[in-house]
């Protein structure tokens, strides 16, 4: 018998052995069993303030806390610490975005740090947007892969 938590929070992940479930707000749903959902972005040139990139979800997808397993790099080290802020819009209100996390490139490197308050999840038609909220004069050619599950 599996003893699920009595008062789960939205998108909470519960694991027993090698199986995991995610609380969708109403029920526990098998997590990670539906296959991968990979999003890739390639933003050429210097990472300038207010550059925008986005993806509209063709299927429901969930991502680990802090976009665990996701990767990013560039072709030139950052002088400062550029920041990309990620936001979500629901399919029903595609122009209304709420921030869900950030990616910061450490100064002097091309190494990212992803931060989210909770594991992000999306339904079909939702949008994830990346907005450069702190640009950098030398970091260039951002390539980014967000790794989630269906």
Model-derived regions, located:
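Extracellular/surface-exposed low-complexity repeats and stalk/linker segments enriched in Gly/Pro
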Residues: 1-18, 29
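Short, charged beta-turn/beta-strand-edge "cap" motif at the junction between a beta-strand
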Residues: 19-21, 134-137
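Short beta-strands within extracellular/lumenal beta-sheet-rich domains
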Residues: 47-61
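A short beta-strand element within beta-rich, extracytoplasmic domains
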Residues: 64-76
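Exposed aromatic-hydrophobic patches
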Residues: 110-119
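Noncatalytic modules at the cell exterior or secretory-pathway interfaces
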Residues: 119-134
């Amino acid at each position: 018998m599996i003893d699920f938590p009595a008062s789960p929070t939205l998108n909470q992940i519960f694991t027993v052995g090698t199986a995991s479930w995610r609380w969708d707000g109403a029920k526990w749903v098998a997590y990670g069993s539906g296959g991968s959902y990979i999003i890739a972005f390639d933003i050429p040139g210097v990472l300038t303030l207010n550059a925008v990139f986005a993806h509209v979800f063709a299927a429901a997808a969930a991502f680990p806390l802090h976009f665990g397993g996701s990767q990013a790099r560039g072709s030139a080290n950052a002088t400062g610490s550029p920041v990309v802020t990620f936001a979500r819009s629901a399919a029903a209100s595609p122009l209304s975005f709420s921030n869900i996390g950030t990616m910061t490139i450490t100064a002097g490197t091309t190494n990212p740090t992803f931060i989210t308050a909770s594991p992000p999840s999306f339904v079909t038609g939702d949008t994830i947007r990346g907005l450069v909220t702190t640009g950098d004069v030398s970091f260039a050619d951002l390539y980014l892969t967000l790794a989630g599950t269906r």
